[in-house]
Amino acid sequence: KGHYKPDKRVGYPPIFVWPLKPVSALVWIFSIPGYFLPWNLFYVFVGLISWFYLSPPLEAYADFNLEIFLIAFARNSFLVGLYFGAFHFRLYVQRAQELEFKFNPRWPSNKSKQFMFGNQNLDNITLTFASGVTIWTGFEVGILWFASNDYISVINAKENLFYFIAMVFLVHLWRDLHFYLIHRLIHFEPLYSLAHRVHHKNVNPGPWSGLAMHPIEHLFYFSCALLYLFVPFHPAFIIITLVHAGL
């Protein structure tokens, strides 16, 4: 059917094989490309920049107000627009690779009744920003409100440097585990019919399809943020975790 086929068989990462291969797993985790490099390190970098340079100080979240929400929403929207927009422009507007690595040779539909406005991209973009980024921002601002009002334990990064560095990298493991569990849950038939089917309309996904979900699924998806109600916390953790989920 003209679908792209990889040159070689795609296998499981060595961390997920049996019998265990600890040496191969460690090599994969720290290799390039591997588990941390390049993408998870990229999310760490974006998250740290977002908190330390693109966010108000923690105390600003103590009195929840619309301005704080809109600042966070604007920053998150900028990240999403830049990230997905770059892939969309390069691969779907310029079509720089044409069909060379495209699994499905068709392009996203712009005449389909199953999508809002009859257009897959407009449908996906609307769900991404109106629901996805809004709920992402809600979890972020909510957790930071708890932290700024001393309802959860906030650490000093300099005084707890080892813990800070460890958590910055371990949050990806939590995010991946949470995604696996949530994904299994939303394939439970009632939840699938109610919410997850919206995501699965994208049988020919594009860059904007990743966050094109029903609001109920977004609530499940971004609930990875709730971990920080229970563990010693630094604001950078929540930003990195949600950047990992959102991008």
Language-model-detected regions and their locations in the chain:
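Non-catalytic, topology-defining segments of multipass membrane proteins
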Residues: 1-181, 202-223
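Membrane-interface helix/loop boundary segments of multi-pass membrane proteins
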Residues: 184-200
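Short, small-residue-rich loop/turn micro-motifs
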Residues: 199-202, 244
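Hydrophobic transmembrane alpha-helices
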Residues: 208-247
